[in-house]
């Protein structure tokens, strides 16, 4: 059975220009978050998530 396409979706809705300034992965916020080291609890959770993928 094929799923029906949603009526409310608009073409280009997920485009970067529709999500505001610095919304993508190259934003300054994303670059700052990536530099912080993980604490022990976050590291353990990360291992579990990678294992489940």
UniProtKB/Swiss-Prot annotation:
Signal peptide: none annotated. InterPro entries: SASP_SspO. One of its GO terms (cellular component) is endospore-forming forespore. It is found in: Spore core. GO terms for biological process: asexual sporulation; sporulation resulting in formation of a cellular spore. Coiled coil: none annotated. Keywords: Sporulation. Residues 1-53 are annotated as: Disordered. It comes from the Bacteria. Pfam families: SspO. Induction: Expressed only in the forespore compartment of sporulating cells. NCBIfam families: spore_sspO. Belongs to the SspO family. This is Small, acid-soluble spore protein O. It comes from Halalkalibacterium halodurans (strain ATCC BAA-125 / DSM 18197 / FERM 7344 / JCM 9153 / C-125) (Bacillus halodurans). The lineage of its organism: Bacteria, Bacillati, Bacillota, Bacilli, Bacillales. The gene is sspO.
């Amino acid at each position: 059975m094929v799923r029906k396409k949603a009526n409310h979706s608009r073409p280009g809705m997920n485009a970067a220009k529709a999500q505001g300034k610095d919304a993508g992965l190259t934003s300054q916020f994303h670059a700052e978050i990536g530099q912080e080291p993980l604490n022990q609890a976050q590291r353990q959770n990360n291992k579990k998530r990678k294992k489940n993928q």
